[in-house]
């Protein structure tokens, strides 16, 4: 057996309490174990909740100061002058407000602020443009490195069933394999699910990694899966203790999107990382792993909200000035805030707000630049092309992602938008978490909603000459339990699949990836990797490799270097 991980020594971590997850540090019988990143094979120390980021550039603006300034300006000068997206930390394309309470600057813990989405102009502005890059790294000399100028990560929220989509096992016992049949694809020797007919014709562009798993380091629940797959860092002991009650911490490791935002030169007008069509989770149930965390909120992605009811509405009025606000009046407000900033700097005897002023300038540029607003305007696309993508929220999110790639945005994340109707039908929370009615929900809803938009995205990028410089990643926080029958939804009769973090699949295309190949295999029932097992850290390193980011050094407050990701290696065989 060819393993990417040497067997680890037994550690002292408590066994997990969730399904689909061997105890941390131990492989299932006969399975390769993942290596712990901490010395001696022990799990990393628990992350400690704190009230501010541990790591940042020494010149990073202090959030508390900037929050005070802008909340003060909103209360005392002209509340209407600050557009909603500046005030609330995310663009809400549905027109719903996310009120900014003045108690924020009086001492609400930053963890609560993160859960609420950063209710301040700082979160709305500083999260827009990834700040000043610490220096884009030169393209590595390894094969395929640096080809990708942009990346689109499509995240199938809830835990997509690998055994029903990318890794079917027609020879497995009936209680494992389910009713779906594999079909031939445009890549010889590769089969996909029969309910992905359009994507099957794009298989010559796909690399399918079938041997991805958490190696016993996760918890079997969503929050840990999000964190591991979005950051490349294994969940610490706080995830094992709190499970899905583990909310984002300021000293978490940053998302892949935020690392790209840090390492790539800032876009002159647009954010360096954008997330569509939502931030994952409710304020009290926010998924960890989406944020810049210890890098500082200036490297957060911009979260752009969309809706199933109005899938084209990634456009004004949310990106426009309010009707009663002219450009001139906005300029006056901007100058007023500049005076407040200058007074604060003089009072402190420092220039710690210098970077924030640059974020403000870019925010003003986005509001007043027609080119910036144009990138979000899907009405500029022809109706036939919109129909090719599918006119639902997934199709329009992927079409917008392509437009943002054309506009030069380095990293776009597209989460699956929850469908309330699916929640009752599949016991899934509205997504891919198919605890019940797994096969009907996949066949009638989830797979068709992915098949058309994803296949069209790959075609569209290729037709425009963009696929070779755009990496497309399709992933999820976990797979589904291969043995059918979820005890929470009627057992075998419920036809659901429970959580399964020991094995899942990820699709890669573009950005130098050689299509028409499969990396790794699973056992006869798709329960565990059988050959070349890898973890999310390897996928993260592969993304960085494709984007030419070979220097993963960042700096703490004392300007001391630290590595953003030490574990894992890029899967260079895929290039």
Residue ranges of predicted features:
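N-terminal leader/targeting signatures
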Residues: 1, 9, 13, 30, ...
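Short, positively charged and aromatic/hydrophobic N-terminal segments
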Residues: 58, 65-72, 78-90
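Serine residues within intrinsically disordered or low-complexity segments
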Residues: 3, 8, 13, 17, ...
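Intrinsic-disorder-associated, low-complexity terminal segments enriched in Asp/Asn/His/Tyr and depleted
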Residues: 2, 11-12, 21, 36, ...
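Ligand-binding pockets and gating/stacking loops
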Residues: 72, 85-575
């Amino acid at each position: 057996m060819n393993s990417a991980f040497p067997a680890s020594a037994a550690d002292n971590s408590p066994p997990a309490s969730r399904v689909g997850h061997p105890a941390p540090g131990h492989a299932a019988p006969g399975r390769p174990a993942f290596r712990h990143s901490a010395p001696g094979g022990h799990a990393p120390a628990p992350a400690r909740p704190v009230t501010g980021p541990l790591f940042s550039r020494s010149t990073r603006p202090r959030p508390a100061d900037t929050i005070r300034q802008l909340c003060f300006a909103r209360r005392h000068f002209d509340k209407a002058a600050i557009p909603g997206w500046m005030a609330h930390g995310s663009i809400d394309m549905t027109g719903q407000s996310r009120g900014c309470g003045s108690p924020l600057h009086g001492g609400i813990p930053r963890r609560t602020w993160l859960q609420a989405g950063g209710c301040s102009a700082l979160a709305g502005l500083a999260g827009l443009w990834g700040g000043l890059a610490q220096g884009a790294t030169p393209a590595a000399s390894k094969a395929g490195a640096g080809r990708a100028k942009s990346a689109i990560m499509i995240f199938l929220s809830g835990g997509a069933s690998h055994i029903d989509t990318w890794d079917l096992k027609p020879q497995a016992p009936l209680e494992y394999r389910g009713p779906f049949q594999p079909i031939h694809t445009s890549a010889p020797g590769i089969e996909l699910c029969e309910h992905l007919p359009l994507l099957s014709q794009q298989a010559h562009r796909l690399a399918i990694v079938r041997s991805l798993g958490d190696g016993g380091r996760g918890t079997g629940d969503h929050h840990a899966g999000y964190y591991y797959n979005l950051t490349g860092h294994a969940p610490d002991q706080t995830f094992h203790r709190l499970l899905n009650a583990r909310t984002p911490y300021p000293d978490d490791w940053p998302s892949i999107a935020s690392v790209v935002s840090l390492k790539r030169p800032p876009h002159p007008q647009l954010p360096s990382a954008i997330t569509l069509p939502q931030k994952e989770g409710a304020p009290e149930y926010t998924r960890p792993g989406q944020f810049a965390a210890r890098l500082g909120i200036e490297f957060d992605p911009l979260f752009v909200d969309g809706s199933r009811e109005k899938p084209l509405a990634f456009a004004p009025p949310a990106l426009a000035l309010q009707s009663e606000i002219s450009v001139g009046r906005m300029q006056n407000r901007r100058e007023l805030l500049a005076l407040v900033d200058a007074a604060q700097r003089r009072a402190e005897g420092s220039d710690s707000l210098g970077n924030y002023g640059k974020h403000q300038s870019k925010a003003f540029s986005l509001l007043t630049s027609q080119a910036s607003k144009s990138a979000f305007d899907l009405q500029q696309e022809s109706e036939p092309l919109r129909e090719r993508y599918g006119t639902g929220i997934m199709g329009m999110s992927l079409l917008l992602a392509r437009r943002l790639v054309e506009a030069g945005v380095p990293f776009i994340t597209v989460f699956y938008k929850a469908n309330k109707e699916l929640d009752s039908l599949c016991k899934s929370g509205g997504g891919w978490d198919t605890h019940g009615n797994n096969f009907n929900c996949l066949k009638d809803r989830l797979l068709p909603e992915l098949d058309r938009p994803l296949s069209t995205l790959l075609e569209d990028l290729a037709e425009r000459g963009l696929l070779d410089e755009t990496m497309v990643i399709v992933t999820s926080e976990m797979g589904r339990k291969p043995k059918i029958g979820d005890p929470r939804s009627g057992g075998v009769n419920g036809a659901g699949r429970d959580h399964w973090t020991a094995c899942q699949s990820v699709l890669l295309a573009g950005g130098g990836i050689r299509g028409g190949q499969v990396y790794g295999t699973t056992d006869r029932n798709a329960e565990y990797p059988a050959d070349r097992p890898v973890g999310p850290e390897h996928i993260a390193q592969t993304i960085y490799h494709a984007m030419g980011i070979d220097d993963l050094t960042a700096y703490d407050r004392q300007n001391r270097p630290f590595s953003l990701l030490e574990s894992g290696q890029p899967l260079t065989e895929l290039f």
